[in-house]
Amino acid sequence: MVAVLTWALALLSAFATVQTQKGFWDYFSQSSGDKSKVARVQQQKLTWEPTSLKDSLEQDLSNMDKFLEKLGPLSGQGREPPGLPHDPEGMRQQLQEELAEVRARLEPYMAEAHQQVGWNLEGLRRQLKPYTVELMEQVARRVQELQEQLRVVGEGTKAQLLGGVDEARGLLQELQTRVVQHTGRVRELFHPYAQRLVTGIGRHVQELHRSVAPHAAASSARLSRCVQTLSRKLTLKAEALHARIQQNLDQLLEELSAFASAGAGGAEEGANSGPQMLSQEVRQRLQAFRHDTFVQIADFTRAIDQETEEVQLQLAPPPPGHSAFAPEFLQADSSEARSKLQARLEDLWEDINDSLHDRGLSHLEEP
């Protein structure tokens, strides 16, 4: 069942993609016997109810002939399809032969659309990369500044231990104050970068919408939904990244303050190793903050790649022969695979219905 539906998906993908290409309609007009038949076929397409195909997809293999009857007018013949063999194997073979012929003619259009949409999405990734690179540079710079500020205080504390406990304790208390001040300053500096990232996502995704519209196989309504969903997902991920960086700063502040307090306690007890241990722990905690934040920024970058690849498959699926064509559908005959197939078929049917409606109106208005 899934294999048959996968072939059906190939056919619908082809028709949905080619609706963006003028060459398809030239082929469509030439393959029909005369212009009057084309007009009648287009009028039949305009009267189809989108729900009819959706309902038929939920039937068992025994009802596949009804599904083929609804696809019949797409061939441009203007007549009912010939009788189908009653055995499932013969039906499957006939369907595969017809789909193979259509795929051979339309596959170049699908490949071109998939490539064009991919180029535009790659452009979006390039536009967002400077934001993440700048954020990583700021993290490294602020960590270095914090380390330098705290190192100066730590060295002074170590020297003062030779003179007296009171002086050392005072410097360790100053270290606690410096920790609070500098982590607070770093927190404030990150806010503008996070805001620029969110603003940049919104602007560049809208630019993507305009640039990908001529090449996408999806209808204008579904294209808008996909772009809006992409913008919302990336914005939420950018905001989550900013929140995680703030949490990292909170943790850093808490840990450094705790170590400074421990160092002050060690100074009161006359422990000469306190400041040395503190200096080492400060470096370790700062490097841990830097590492964790870099990992989170890298995860955000990979999320951008993943989301844009998913959008490419939605807006312009690759040809059936492509390695990226519905790999999850071909692995097993599972309910999940069937559900995904139905969801994509419903999207493609929406695209085809909108395209036929628009084209039908334009052809009927011709003198």
From Swiss-Prot:
SUPFAM superfamilies: Apolipoprotein A-I (SSF58113). InterPro entries: ApoA_E, Apolipoprotein_A1/A4/E. Phosphorylated by FAM20C in the extracellular medium. It comes from the Eukaryota. The modification Phosphoserine is found at S56. Keywords: Chylomicron, Coiled coil, Endosome, Golgi apparatus, HDL, Lipid transport, Phosphoprotein, Secreted, Signal, Transport, VLDL. One of its GO terms (biological process) is cholesterol metabolic process. GO terms for cellular component: chylomicron; early endosome; extracellular vesicle; Golgi apparatus; high-density lipoprotein particle; late endosome; very-low-density lipoprotein particle. It is found in: Secreted; Early endosome; Late endosome; Golgi apparatus, trans-Golgi network. Residues 71-90 are annotated as: Disordered. One of its GO terms (molecular function) is phospholipid binding. Belongs to the apolipoprotein A1/A4/E family. Interacts with GPIHBP1. Interacts with SORL1; this interaction leads to APOA5 internalization and sorting either to lysosomes and degradation, or to the trans-Golgi network. Minor apolipoprotein mainly associated with HDL and to a lesser extent with VLDL. May also be associated with chylomicrons. Important determinant of plasma triglyceride (TG) levels by both being a potent stimulator of apo-CII lipoprotein lipase (LPL) TG hydrolysis and an inhibitor of the hepatic VLDL-TG production rate (without affecting the VLDL-apoB production rate). Activates poorly lecithin:cholesterol acyltransferase (LCAT) and does not enhance efflux of cholesterol from macrophages. Binds heparin. This is Apolipoprotein A-V. It comes from Leptonychotes weddellii.
